[in-house]
């Protein structure tokens, strides 16, 4: 079985929470844009996202007072390098996690962080995990600041400092489900967590031990999954997605996930920009 079969995502360009995969658009927008959708080939399009970003359609929507930007932001996957091995940006990553937070209503999506988060004021280093669990920590879902109880937390970090252009993406996942809670670090290259991450994990562990009896820290790094120079972003997002779908962290310890599977996973992550 392919690892992709263990998760609930699909190559559809619709956002994960859209159940009607025949169309990603709301019924109102479908109705208003029927004539454009029926002749999308004449616009040079083969997808709904292409249609609603076409200049002629955008001009028509503006005249009609239709908010197509909201459709793109909430009903479609994020734009990104879907059919190539382009490096993922922080926008690709954060926009994907924001969309997953719509589908997984107990997931706290934390904006990306660089590795000097102890010195720079990144959200990652300011989060109180007890407040996350109790629904007292602000997060952004569908463009709105909300507070809601969350039993999972995910963030993608870059191993470079904020003065650099980026080196390697890694994932943090906090699982506050079940009897034993865990604070997990995943690195597709198999490298151990650096000092700032170790200190962050220990600090969060002490926070959570105030409200739960068993909390452990895990470095899921015993296998070098990644062999390419491009897939650290997809691997990091895949780890978070797999854990949200209840794939155990032990799977990443016992089974190598290939770069080829991450090439395919890109079609699950993004719509064509």
From Swiss-Prot:
Q: Which UniProt keywords apply?
A: Host cytoplasm, Host-virus interaction, Hydrolase, Inhibition of host innate immune response by virus, Late protein, Protease, Thiol protease, Viral immunoevasion, Virion
Subcellular location per the Swiss-Prot or TrEMBL entry: Host cytoplasm; Virion
The top EC class is hydrolase
**Which amino acids does the record list as binding substrate?**
226
Induction profile: Expressed in the late phase of the viral replicative cycle.
Primary localization class, coarse:
host cell
User: Matching InterPro entries, A to Z?
Assistant: Papain-like_cys_pep_sf (IPR038765), Peptidase_C48_C (IPR003653), VPRT (IPR016510)
Write the protein's name.
Answer: SUMO-1 cysteine protease S273R
Report the SUPFAM superfamilies cross-referenced here. Answer: Cysteine proteinases (SSF54001)
Single GO cellular component annotation?
virion component
Lineage, opening ranks = Viruses, Varidnaviria, Bamfordvirae, Nucleocytoviricota, Pokkesviricetes
């Amino acid at each position: 079985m392919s690892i992709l079969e263990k998760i609930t995502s699909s190559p559809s360009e619709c956002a994960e929470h859209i159940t009607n995969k025949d169309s990603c658009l709301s019924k109102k927008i479908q109705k208003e844009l029927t004539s454009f959708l029926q002749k999308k080939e004449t616009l040079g399009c083969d997808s709904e996202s292409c249609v609603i970003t076409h200049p002629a359609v955008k001009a028509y929507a503006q005249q009609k007072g239709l908010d197509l930007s909201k459709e793109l932001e909430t009903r479609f996957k994020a734009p990104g390098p879907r059919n190539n091995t382009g490096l993922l940006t922080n926008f690709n990553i954060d926009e994907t996690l924001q969309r997953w937070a719509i589908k997984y209503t107990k997931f706290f999506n934390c904006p990306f962080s660089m590795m000097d988060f102890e010195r720079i004021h990144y959200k990652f280093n300011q989060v109180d995990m007890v407040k996350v669990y109790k629904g007292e920590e602000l997060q952004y879902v569908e463009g709105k600041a909300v507070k809601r109880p969350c039993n999972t937390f995910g963030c993608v970090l870059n191993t470079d400092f904020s003065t650099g252009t980026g080196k390697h993406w890694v994932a943090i996942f906090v699982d506050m489900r079940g009897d034993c809670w865990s604070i997990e670090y995943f690195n597709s290259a198999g490298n151990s967590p650096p000092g700032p991450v170790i200190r962050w994990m220990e600090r969060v562990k002490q926070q959570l031990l105030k409200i739960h009896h068993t909390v452990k820290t895990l470095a899921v790094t015993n296998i070098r999954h990644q062999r390419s120079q491009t897939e650290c972003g997809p691997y990091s997002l895949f780890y978070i997605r797999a854990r949200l779908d209840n794939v155990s962290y032990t799977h990443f310890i016992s089974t190598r996930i290939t770069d080829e599977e991450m090439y395919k996973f890109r079609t699950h992550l993004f719509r064509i920009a």
